[in-house]
């Protein structure tokens, strides 16, 4: 099993949920309006630092995680200017 943590900054978070559904991620949790700091600066949802992110956590079987990771990488390369997706894949020993 693998845990995927996906962070998307952009106006179309359904891009990510569509990929999760297409790759049969049997469950995921979505957190909207996330704020933070990254390589392109701060996102705080304010006038000074506009923007926010959406992030997801999903536990998937390893072969499916690899396929999903590849699709997310492809999606990332085709995003419009200003939109970003970052993904971390972590080993999961148990999940209940």
Where does each model-flagged region fall?
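Positively charged, small/polar-rich N-terminal and surface patches that mediate targeting and assembly
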Residues: 1-96
């Amino acid at each position: 099993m693998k845990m995927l943590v996906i962070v998307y900054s952009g106006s179309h978070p359904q891009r990510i949920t569509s990929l999760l559904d297409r790759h049969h991620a049997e469950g995921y949790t979505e957190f909207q309006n996330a704020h933070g700091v990254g390589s392109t600066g701060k996102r705080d949802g304010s006038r000074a630092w506009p923007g926010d992110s959406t992030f997801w956590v999903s536990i998937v079987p390893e072969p499916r995680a690899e396929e999903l990771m590849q699709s997310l990488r492809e999606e990332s390369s085709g995003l419009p200017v200003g939109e970003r997706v970052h993904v971390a894949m972590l080993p999961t020993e148990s999940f209940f």
